[in-house]
Structure formats: C-alpha cells, structure tokens
Amino acid sequence: MESWLFLIGIFIVALLGKNQSLIIASIVVLFLKLIPYSDKIFPLLNKQGINWGVTIISITILVPIATGKIGFMDLVNSFKSPVGWIAVACGILVSLLSYQGVGFLSASPEVTVALVMGTIIGVVFMNGIAAGPIIASGIAYLIIQLLQIQIK
C-alpha cells in the first residue's frame, strides 16, 4: 500500500509541476503494478531500464548524423574551439561519473531514495530534466570519496 501512495504522490507532484516525463513514468509504473506478473516485470525494468533509456538517448543523439544535419566536418570543427574541447571534456567527465554512479547505486540502494527525491524536486520545482539520477549518484559518489565518508 505504501508504494501505491508514494507513486500516486509522485504523480500528483508531477501534475502540479506539469512535468510530462514524470507524469508518464508514474502512470506507466502504476499501470504495471496492476498487471498480475509485475513481480517479473519490475526486476527486469530495474536491472535493464537504465540501459534501455541510455540506448534511446543514444539513438536520439545519433539522429542528426543520420539525417545529415551533423557531418564529419562538424566533428572536426568542434575541436577547433575552446567550447568544443570543453564539451568533449564534459562528455568524458559525465560518462565517468555515470559509470561510478551505476556502481554506487548497486552497492548502496538506500541512496536511491534520496537521489529520486532530489531528482523529483529538481524536475518538478526547478524545471530540470530527469536525466540525472545516474550522474547525480556519480557526483554523490565522488563527493563521498573526497570527504572520505564511509558507505554502509
């Protein structure tokens, strides 16, 4: 019962914040809870969902290349400016933080609740995008390591 109330609460907050992605996500999860074999579906989504999401984002990023909006010369030209180098460095940093984040979430599932709450607050009340839980966990991991805080 608690999970239903929690999900409905997230749905209401998403509605109030007019966040379409979170509205759809909460409706889908609530709907899946109604399906008799959701106990088989949720572990699969929990394990593979992020990979599927990253794949969809990767496909979206590659579409401009497929349509010809971005060509090889655009890639070459991106290395001719400080902005391009900064973008490449940030891409590398985010991928490394995300890698640490996935491991951190697996090793410390209790952190997931806090990250989800932070993501919801950022998405609903600050017009953020819910692409950040993995990166957020990577940043949290980095800060925890820098501060030498022991993880349970």
Swiss-Prot record:
The chain crosses the membrane at residues 4-24, 52-72, 85-105, 115-135. Keywords: Cell membrane, Membrane, Transmembrane, Transmembrane helix. GO terms for cellular component: plasma membrane. It comes from the Bacteria. It is a multi-pass membrane protein. Its main location: membrane. It is found in: Cell membrane. The keyword Phosphoprotein does not apply. Belongs to the UPF0756 family. This is UPF0756 membrane protein PEPE_1090. It comes from Pediococcus pentosaceus (strain ATCC 25745 / CCUG 21536 / LMG 10740 / 183-1w).
